[in-house]
Amino acid sequence: MRRSTPAATPVAEASGTGGGSVRIHYRRPPDRLQLLEQAVVEDDGRCIVTWLPSAQLTKPVMAGGRVVLEPGAPVVWFTWRGDVWHDVGRFHLADGTFTGFYANVLTPVVMDGAEWETTDLFLDVWMGTDGEVAILDRDEFDAALDAGWIDAPTAARALAEAERLAADACAGTWPPAHVREWTLERAREAVG
């Protein structure tokens, strides 16, 4: 698996502004590939904020027995350069109601200009607006490991990442302030 490095080609000049779009090659073992296109709303040289105006889902995303993302709902995504093993989404309902923060544990994103590539490692971390923190999809992760879709070192790194994010959320240090500051309204204003 290729990894992102700090020398990877930036999506936009790191000026604090965005512009343009990215196409994400999002792999999920064993053989699923999704191509996702999102508008870049900010690129500060370390974190790229992207906007997905309408989540293309076949069913709602659930956490803690509640719907946290509906088909057609907007999402503000945060993806970091370098050796970062997760991204973060600010999740909403279709009417724009904020529901919480969702981290996908994944391989570091390889960024080649506006083309990105990453592999989902099954685990997710959820922090709802009520402060609930949970590691999600452990059953899918265990099944993928048993099937040989993820090797043992990658699985260990993924589990450590999920546990660290959950612990940081419980301690009040995750998500970072930059993520908390990017509200749905701010993202909508940034894309015009």
Residue ranges and their predicted role:
Residues 1-73:
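Charge-rich, low-complexity N-terminal segments
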Residues 121-166:
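A hydrophobic, small-residue-rich beta->alpha segment in the mid-to-C-terminal subdomain
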Residues 43-46, 94-95, 128-130:
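Short acidic-glycine loop/turn motifs at beta-strand connectors
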Residues 160-192:
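Cysteine/selenocysteine-centered motifs that mediate thiol-based redox chemistry or coordinate metal-sulfur cofactors
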Residues 59-64, 113, 144-148:
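A short, polar/proline- and glycine-enriched secondary-structure boundary/capping micro-motif
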Residues 11-12, 37-39, 111-114, 123-124:
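A generic local secondary-structure boundary/capping motif
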Residues 48-51, 97-104, 132-139:
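Short, well-ordered strand-loop elements centered on a beta-strand within folded domains, enriched
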Residues 67-110, 116, 120-123:
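Phosphate/ribose-recognition catalytic cores of enzymes acting on nucleotide-derived substrates
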